[in-house]
Amino acid sequence: SLLSIVLLLSVQLIAQSVPSPKSHFGFNIGDNYKLTTFTATEAYLKKVEASSNKVKLVTIGKTEEGRNHYMMVVSSPENIKQLQKYKSISQKLARAEGLSDEDAKQLADDGKAVVWIDGGLHATEVVGIHQWIETMYQIITRQDEETKNILKNTIILFVHANPDGQELVSNWYMRNTDTLKRSTAALPRLYQKYIGHDNNRDFFMMNMSESKNMSRQQYIEWMPQILYNHHQTGPAGTVVAGPPYRDPFNYVYSPLLITSLDAMGAAMSSRLNAEQKPGYTMKGGSVYSTWWNGGLRTTAYYHNIVGILTEIIGSPTPMNIPLVPQRLIPNSGLPFPIAPQKWYFKNSIDYSISLNYAVLNYAAR
């Protein structure tokens, strides 16, 4: 019918009107030897907000160097119109004050799963903020049924974890016109004004403004049910380390928190395997656990938030996956080993998008 054609065209126009990363930054996210600054990212976020009814750009505070600290809320247009309602439901469920089991079940039915996805906390781990930009763009513009279902049933909090660090590291890397000399090494100063890499040790005391900004969203404003904290790098001979984490787990947590984390890990590793993306290691295949409890992800466990950490390889300067003989034999910690090979930034971006989609697909069900 004519109406169907008009609706289809309008959907296509909406997708086309959201600027692609390449149209804004001048290169595709994941291109070799290319990083983007926070200044350019901030301008991109504003363009996306102006062109899409699936987003709400929120300034959650200022950074220590005085930049705006952003969170992009992404969901269906219908949900975006009712964010306060869904935030209130998430708060009530998290605090559980005066709720009967029946009340809680009704709220869970009425609400939407709230999922936090961040990027860039450790600014030299440059996959983080770049996968964040590309995932956001794809979630907003893709028209497949999975994406539509995710937007309908979840509210995604895309949180920039370190604007100051992105500006410093990207400018430092891109300063050389000779691409072969580009490197994030030997930064002239800390990539968080006062504590640098230890910005992920600040979430139990919140001395830094960025930690306060993010913790306010985590524990007062939104209380996400799932929190995905992106890091680098993966163990040698693999691509990415993620949940389930190694034993022993922190036994003060609810068993349901641990099994939910393990289920999330199963969804993530299975998706990569189904997409023929080998190299996901878990359990005893990495050193990561649930025991360090002052970080962005691990502090969340004390609030019964399913906190996910992945550590992935990758750099805009192409690299090699080395030969590690003990990593070539499949086992429960590495069911699908990866052979030694050349590795590109785009590979890591693609893996990260798959992992984000696995988490969001799980949350939407």
PLM regions and their residue ranges:
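Bacterial Sec-dependent N-terminal signal peptides
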Residues: S1-S20
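Structured catalytic-domain cores with a bias toward divalent-metal coordination
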Residues: Q16-R365
